[in-house]
């Protein structure tokens, strides 16, 4: 038996000690988390909403009315993604893919429905009188077939004879005028119905019963309403057009009970909408967190409500408030995707309590596939002064470059990490390569080390020795000899490199500073005797000693000639 737990972006599988109660299964199940992140269309939703979120954070808290603008931008992004998903789903022949897109469309429809209702009830906070008008717009937005039927009827040659005519009756009176005259008109129509004035015309009588809000008549038209909340708004329009926000929950529960038969099971969406009608925003957020397949909705809705000053302080047990907790969960999910992780950084930035700590943990898990990506991650860390992460990234890239024998890149990363030990190691590799090949690689980097060469003694020697070669190549022998002597006296040259250094310096032995070279040669001779080097190296020492003696003699002769 195997158990598993979700980790940051991956799954942890572990062995359990449960005894199997029967034979094991023959199937291997593939488990995925946050599968929506891999949808190219839904990634547009995440990217677009990221820009809206960042813009919302820059709005001055002293101007809460401005916070109310982004909610429509969020909804327009939801609508655009949903329409694109519907178009793609209609063209796909793969049944499995089609089902997947269909499920995503259904989820986005539910998200838009809940989001729009939260706008009406919480953000716009429509008062009694105009509340019903907002609810009518809400239902019309999510019951578009009514407008389509009305358009078909009006565009037909004979609208009164169209088969959908009685389904979409149209009036010449605005809703505002209707609201003013409604009570007197309602009493008059009710009186006519009781007198059976319209009994001879079934359709006219049906319309009048609907207009006075007869519940039995409305329920008979269930197939035209399709949902209980459509039935709710219809009932309120004809029975209680000036309903108060505080009474909404009573009518919502009543309509749900009336619309659904006893055998119907209440869907999670119904519970969420009921919670909204009860103005229980915390229950809406809680149920959406459980039902929806990602944290996008609850994270952005909670942030928006927080900016509108509609959320009271609601601290959680581990110190983070609800807004921050949901944003952290959403951002952590984004970090698992190869292109969305950069969006997640901004969400962490706007979580003042735990955002930085979470970002430090997540940024270390970003796979540094390429040097370009590593530079992106590094820039993010440097902008936020995350020194530990900067050093870690640079060390990883330096080690990777060293394994690939890219010494220049490795040295550059180690300098950026300010890692003296690693810079020393790479400098040694440069010197070893020089001994083997007789030339330096990555001359541009070594020539432009600047103050960075002071990071370690070995790096300083590498830079200065390269400078010696440049002086030698430019035939500035005196300056080259002085630099070489300073390297000797500073004792920063590795002893293993003295042989190569003296061999390169032979043409300079005619200078008067040859005594320093002789002392160095004695130390080199002692080292070989102690370590028992091969005869070949000992032969080189003897040749160097011979050359040194010859050049010393020539220098003495020249000096004596000049004195006489």
Each language-model region and where it sits:
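Long, acidic/serine-threonine-rich intrinsically disordered regions with weak helical/coil propensity
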Residues: 1-150, 247-343, 353, 420
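Extended HEAT/HEAT-like alpha-solenoid repeat tracts in very large eukaryotic scaffold/adaptor proteins
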Residues: 81, 106-117, 131, 162, ...
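A cross-kingdom feature marking charged/low-complexity
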Residues: 122-159, 166-209, 368-389, 434-476, ...
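Alpha-helical solenoid scaffolds that mediate protein-protein interactions
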Residues: 142, 351, 362, 384, ...
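Internal alpha-helical scaffold/solenoid segments in large eukaryotic proteins
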Residues: 155, 160-164, 170, 324-333, ...
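Extended alpha-helical solenoid scaffold regions that build the rod-like backbones
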Residues: 192-397, 401, 491, 498-510, ...
């Amino acid at each position: 038996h195997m158990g598993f737990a979700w980790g940051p972006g991956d799954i942890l599988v572990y062995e359990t000690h449960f005894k199997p109660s029967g034979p094991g299964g023959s199937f291997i199940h593939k488990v995925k988390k946050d599968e929506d992140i891999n949808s190219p269309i839904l990634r547009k939703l995440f990217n677009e909403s990221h820009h809206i979120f960042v813009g919302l954070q820059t709005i001055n808290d002293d101007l809460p009315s401005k916070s109310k603008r982004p909610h429509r931008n969020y909804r327009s992004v939801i609508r655009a993604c949903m329409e694109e998903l519907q178009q793609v789903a209609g063209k796909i022949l793969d049944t499995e893919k089609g089902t997947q897109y269909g499920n995503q469309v259904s989820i986005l429809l539910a998200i838009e429905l809940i989001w729009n209702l939260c706008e009406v009830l919480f953000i716009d906070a429509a008062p009694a009188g105009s509340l019903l008008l907002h609810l009518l717009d809400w239902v019309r937005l999510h019951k578009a077939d009514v407008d389509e039927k009305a358009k078909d009827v009006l565009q037909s040659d004979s609208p009164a004879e169209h088969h959908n005519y009685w389904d979409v009756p149209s009036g010449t009176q605005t809703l505002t005028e209707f609201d003013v005259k409604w009570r007197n008109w309602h009493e008059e129509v009710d009186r006519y119905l009781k007198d059976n004035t319209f009994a001879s015309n079934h359709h006219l009588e049906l319309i009048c019963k609907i207009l006075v809000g007869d519940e039995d008549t409305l329920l008979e038209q269930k197939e035209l309403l399709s949902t209980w909340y459509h039935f709710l708004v219809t009932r309120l329009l004809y029975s209680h057009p000036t309903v108060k926000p505080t009474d909404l929950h009573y009518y919502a529960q009543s309509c749900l009970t009336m619309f659904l038969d006893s055998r119907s099971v209440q869907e999670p969406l119904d519970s969420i909408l009921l919670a909204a009608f009860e103005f229980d925003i915390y229950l809406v957020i809680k149920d959406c967190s459980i039902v929806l397949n990602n944290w996008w909705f609850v994270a952005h809705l909670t942030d928006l409500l927080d900016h509108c000053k509609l959320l009271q302080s609601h601290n959680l047990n581990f110190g983070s408030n609800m807004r921050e907790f949901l944003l952290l969960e959403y951002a952590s999910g984004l970090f698992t995707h190869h292109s969305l992780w950069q969006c997640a950084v901004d969400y962490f930035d706007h979580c003042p309590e735990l955002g930085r700590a979470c970002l430090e943990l997540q940024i270390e898990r970003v796979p540094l596939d390429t040097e370009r990506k590593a530079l992106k991650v590094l820039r993010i860390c440097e902008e936020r002064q995350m020194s530990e992460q900067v050093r870690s990234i640079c060390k990883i890239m330096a080690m990777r470059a060293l394994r690939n024998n890219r010494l220049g890149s490795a040295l550059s990363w180690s300098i950026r990490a300010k890692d003296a030990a690693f810079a020393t190691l790479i400098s040694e590799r440069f010197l070893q390569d020089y001994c083997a090949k007789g030339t330096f690689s990555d001359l541009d980097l070594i020539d432009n080390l600047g103050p960075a060469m002071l990071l370690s003694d070995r790096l300083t020697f590498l830079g200065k020795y390269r400078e010696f070669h440049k002086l030698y190549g430019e035939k500035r022998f005196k300056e080259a000899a002085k630099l070489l002597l300073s390297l000797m006296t500073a004792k920063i040259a590795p002893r293993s490199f003295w042989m190569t250094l003296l061999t390169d310096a032979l043409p300079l032995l005619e200078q008067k500073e040859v005594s320093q070279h002789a002392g160095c040669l004695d130390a080199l001779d002692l080292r070989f005797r102690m370590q028992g080097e091969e005869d070949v190296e000992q032969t080189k020492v003897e040749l160097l000693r011979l050359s040194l003696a010859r050049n010393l003699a020539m220098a003495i002769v020249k000096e004596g000639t000049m004195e006489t």
